[in-house]
A protein has these predicted regions:
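A generic structural motif
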Residues: 57-67, 102-109
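Short amphipathic alpha-helix with an adjacent loop that forms part of the alpha/beta core around
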Residues: 66-74
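Glycine-rich phosphate/adenylate-binding loop
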Residues: 1-20, 25, 73-78, 82-221
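Glycine-rich adenosine-cofactor-binding loop
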Residues: 22-62, 162-169
């Protein structure tokens, strides 16, 4: 199976890029191997939940290096957990390797799941940073101070966020397994925020940023 029909939906909704500047590596057949990258309770809960559901789960937390590059990770999906901001070298490595990835974190007690990135086909984490910098010129400075800093939330909220992330991994797995029947995974170009007091869910849409390197060469400049 492939993601052709899923990508057609993405193009129709404007969440995908026409053409590629970085290579997307298709997930063949089914989503099986997942790497949970990050240190903290959120990653722990999610890794346990995914393993119990039958996925082959690998844990990691270190920075990539020349000896251990991201391109060497044998995985179908990387879930970036816990850290408010992940290492720029890691993000660049995932994009260059064409590895699908999902960000999951706690921020000031709020659980945030997404976006789900298909490199070169959907908006990416750098797109979000560029959008935030457009609104707040100080964001690049703030972001640099948050690299590998774990967010925190109440234990129940953390478990609920892990469960929500697992649900969206299942959505992707179903879209790959049965593209004719499954709906479009909700987190392509979107984040879902789980708030409490009062309990509510907020969805935000992130379009591809015109200055991001993930855009096709023809669309830049």
């Amino acid at each position: 199976a492939d993601l052709i029909r899923v990508l057609e939906h993405l193009l129709a909704t404007g969440l995908a890029l026409r053409g590629r500047r970085v290579p997307f590596r298709p997930i063949e057949g089914r989503l099986r191997r997942i790497r949970v990258h990050g240190t903290g309770p959120l990653g722990g809960h999610l890794a346990t939940s995914l393993a119990d559901a039958g996925f082959s789960v690998t844990r990691s937390s270190g920075r990539p290096s020349l000896d251990h590059p991201v391109s060497g990770w044998a995985t179908d999906l990387v879930v970036l957990t816990d850290y408010l901001v992940h290492d720029t070298m890691l993000i660049a490595g995932l994009m260059d390797a064409g590895t699908p990835h999902l960000q999951v974190r706690m921020r000031d007690g709020v659980g945030i799941v997404g976006p789900l990135v298909l490199p070169g086909l959907t908006s990416c984490l750098i797109c979000i940073d560029l959008h935030r910098a457009d609104r707040d010129p100080e964001w690049p400075i703030v972001s640099a101070q948050l690299v590998r800093v774990a967010g925190h939330g109440r234990p129940a909220a953390t478990r609920a966020t892990a469960a929500l992330a697992h649900e969206h991994v299942d959505q992707l797995a179903e879209a790959i397994r049965s593209p004719d029947r499954a709906g479009l995974p909700e987190l392509f170009g979107r984040t879902v925020e789980l708030h409490s007091e009062p309990t509510r869910i907020v969805t935000k849409t992130w379009a591809p940023h015109p200055l991001c390197r993930c855009r096709p060469a023809a669309a830049v400049g």
